[in-house]
A protein has these predicted regions:
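N-terminal non-catalytic structural scaffold regions of very large proteins
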Residues: 5, 10-284
Length: 284
């Protein structure tokens, strides 16, 4: 449904005042109106009239995040908005941020129509992204997860696992996870691998020697893409409510199984977001 156009202030767009004047004074000559139009023309090179494209794009995603706080939406719909925010943020870094970084690397920095240089835009975006991520996790942990728990939907952390659930997760790891994961040791002969875009990975600090007698202080464990990130606990294990466990929690719990004879000193999960702002070359 079409809505009535919003009125803009005189200092933002003087041309509208001319239109209004012509409507109330139809006998005004075209020559006089054209002269007034030229004297009131906007300087299109003035950066005040432009919004930075990347910042505007990110502001849109902030509006998506705000919908996750809107109590007028159903609970699962609010959770869905939180997921959309994450998906949009991935795409934003793949396309927009990668484009800005490419400009920095080229050394040919030029300000945009808004007057901001790529380095300035990146600094602003990084500050705003940190604040948005803090807000995202606050909404998840303080609002959505407690509300879901009241509806008997639980996302179980490792410290919440019962003995029965612990035994089930160990069986799931042995049968489903262990056979499809190949850890990657990092040493001078094995540099950092090219990981799949947006895949879940773990980087580990190790102590001791592997089965071949080699010392490897670092290793990467890529999570299998064939398995779901969220695993539903069977009813015969937990009959009440709907209970879920993250695949990352299971891997983290049993990650030492990949390195017999070695001690895992640290285990941290990470993702790599790659540049997807590709340029098409002309084929002659």
């Amino acid at each position: 449904m079409d809505s009535e156009p919003k009125k803009m202030s005189k200092d933002r767009l003087p041309k509208l005042e001319l239109v209004k004047d012509l409507e109330t004074n139809p006998d005004r000559s075209y020559k006089n109106s054209q002269s007034q139009l030229q004297s009131e023309d906007i300087d299109l090179n003035d950066s005040r009239y432009y919004e930075n494209r990347e910042l505007s794009h990110f502001k849109f995603n902030l509006r998506v995040l705000s919908q996750a706080k809107n109590l007028n939406h159903p609970l699962l719909e609010r959770l869905r908005f939180l997921l959309i925010f994450s998906s949009n943020l991935d795409e934003f870094f793949e396309i927009r941020i990668s484009g800005l970084k490419k400009q920095l690397e080229s050394g040919r920095q030029r300000p945009g129509p808004d007057g901001k240089f790529p380095e300035q835009v990146l600094k602003i975006i990084h500050e705003q992204v940190r604040e948005a991520l803090d807000e995202q996790y606050r909404i998840l942990n303080e609002d959505l997860l407690p509300d879901l728990a009241r509806e008997h939907i639980h996302f179980l952390q490792r410290h919440e696992w019962s003995k029965n659930l612990q035994a089930w997760t160990k069986s799931y790891f042995t049968d489903e996870v262990l056979p499809v994961i190949s850890p990657l040791g990092l040493d001078p002969a094995h540099p950092f691998p090219r990981l799949v875009n947006k895949s879940l990975n773990f980087i580990l600090t190790l102590e001791g020697k592997d089965a071949f007698g080699r010392e490897s202080g670092l290793a990467i464990v890529p999570a299998p893409r064939a398995l779901p990130r969220l695993i539903k606990v069977p009813r015969d294990i937990m009959p009440e409510g709907d209970n879920f466990i993250f695949l990352s929690s299971i891997i983290h719990e049993y990650v030492e199984e990949f390195f017999p004879g070695m001690t895992v000193k640290g285990c941290h999960q990470f993702r790599v977001t790659r540049n997807s702002n590709l340029e098409m070359s002309k084929v002659e």
